Amino acid sequence: MTIRNDGAGPKKHRGERRIQCLAIALALFHSTGARADEPARATGEKLAAEAPRKTVESIAKEVRDSIVTIRFQGRGGSDQGLGTGFVIGADGLIASNYHVIGEARPVSVELADGSRHDVTEIHASDRAADLAIVRIARQGLAPLALGAPETLADGAEVVAVGNPHGLERSVVAGRVSGKREIDGRSMIQLAIPIEPGNSGGPLLDMEGKVHGILTMKSLVTPFLGFAIGIDQLQPLIDKPNPVAIDRWLTIGTLDAGEWTTTGGARWRQRAGRIGVEGTGTGFGGRSLCLATTEPPPLPHDLAVWVKLDDEDGAAGLVFAADGADRHYGFYPTAGK
């Protein structure tokens, strides 16, 4: 058999050849485009990973104008308590701890520029959660950005800003050392010393976002503190329960028709329980709360439950008093 190759074969139309060339060109374009895109994407990811993180110094500078000092007053009108807060609303909203604002006390806020403003309302509060938002008559404040608590991992670097022992806007860096349940509340455990005056300050990540509110220190382990997650503040932001300061000051006031007090100190009533804070001006630092109603006819029983929050305090029951230092009773705490 003779095979002849004279170059003859089936003819291809010119249009068909064009389609084939176009298909090859498209294939080459997509192939080279994919290869070119991969290095670009990798380069972008590398640049994002290598982007410089903020330093503690830069974060402290950025948030300085948003940190405030909160003071509440005692009976004589002088400052009795001091804590920290931070701006969450440009229209004068400040977040802090409930225990920082002092229940039924006049409250004032000092801004970074040194100006002092009386709180006009308790915008939102939750005594059980130990959280509060107050309002001052000041516009144009610089609110801090709030972070997502679930993104704050154990071991993460954090920055705390507050007023420990009155040392305003002090900055300390540390790490998240865990999450703990304390008295039924979820808390962020910190390898950071938290001192009196720090309460209510922000716990910041390395982007300057707030992830928690500094709340308490460990009484057992030094340089260990706890913060309330910022997610627990969100319900107060979403559904505030505003109370004008005039009404706030009357919360817990004793019924003058049933009780009278002597010797100073601060007596309050809540949910049928009477409590007292501070040292009285009477003998031995005593202060009395006396019933003004007539007792029932004898014989009758009287039951009283006494709880001391301070080991230095003492409590007693008074059966008769002359309105001054002279009174009769006994101290179930043995004066201790």
What are these regions (language model features)?
Residues 1-5, 10-61, 79-80, 93, ...:
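N-terminal targeting leaders that route proteins to membranes or the secretory/organellar pathways
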Residues 281-336:
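Secretory/extracellular carbohydrate-interaction modules
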Residues 267-284:
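Short carbohydrate-recognition loop motifs
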